C-alpha cells in the first residue's frame, strides 16, 4: 500500500490501522525512504484527525463492516474520506457476511453502491431472513445475494495468496 501511495504521487497520506501495527508500518515507511508525508493513527483516535489528506489507507478494513448501523469509526472515516481515494487492506474483507462490504464502501464518495442507507442496500442485495436471539425473533441481515454483491465490487478487489504476498509458513 505504501508503494502504491508512492506510485500514485501522494503528498500527504493518512494510514489507519490497529494500534499494535503502527510501529511495523512506520518501519516499512522508513524503508521506502519517506516519499510523502504520512500520518499513522489507530482507529480509536480518528476523532483527532483532520481531513486534509490526499490519500487514505485503511488497514484491517473488515473492522468497518458492522451492520445494520455504522460504527462510530465509520462515521468519522466518512467525514475524513469524502472525495478522497482510499486503499482498503484486509486479509478477510467479509469474514462473516457479504453485508460487511456495505459500510466499508459507505465511507467512500466513490462507493460502488448507490444506496445511502444499509436498509436500502439490503432491499437490493439482501435475502430476507429471521433468526432467534435470546428467545426473540429478529431480522437477520447477514444473508445476501452473493453474486450481485460481487458483481458490484469485484473490479475493486485484488486478491493474493499468502505466498504471492511474500508470507512464508513456519
Which role fits each region the language model picked out?
Residues 2-4, 28-31, 53, 70-74, ...:
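Short, glycine/charged-enriched secondary-structure capping and boundary segments
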Amino acid at each position: 500500500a505504501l508503494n502504491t501511495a508512492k506510485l500514485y504521487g501522494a503528498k500527504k497520506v493518512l494510514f489507519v490501522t490497529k494500534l499494535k501495527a503502527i510501529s511495523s508500518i512506520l518501519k516499512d515507511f522508513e524503508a521506502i525512504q519517506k516519499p510523502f508525508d504520512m500520518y499513522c493513527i489507530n482507529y480509536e483516535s480518528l476523532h483527532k484527525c483532520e481531513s486534509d489528506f490526499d490519500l487514505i489507507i485503511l488497514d484491517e478494513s473488515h473492522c468497518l463492516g458492522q451492520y445494520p448501523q455504522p460504527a462510530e469509526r465509520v462515521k468519522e472515516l466518512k467525514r475524513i474520506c469524502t472525495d478522497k481515494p482510499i486503499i482498503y487492506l484486509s486479509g478477510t474483507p467479509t469474514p462473516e457476511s457479504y453485508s460487511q462490504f456495505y459500510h466499508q464502501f459507505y465511507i467512500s464518495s466513490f462507493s460502488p453502491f448507490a444506496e445511502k442507507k444499509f436498509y436500502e442496500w439490503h432491499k437490493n442485495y439482501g435475502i430476507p431472513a429471521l433468526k432467534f436471539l435470546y428467545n426473540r425473533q429478529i431480522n437477520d441481515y447477514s444473508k445476501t445475494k452473493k453474486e450481485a454483491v460481487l458483481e458490484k465490487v469485484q473490479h475493486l478487489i485484488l486478491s493474493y495468496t499468502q505466498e504471492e504476498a511474500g508470507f512464508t509458513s513456519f
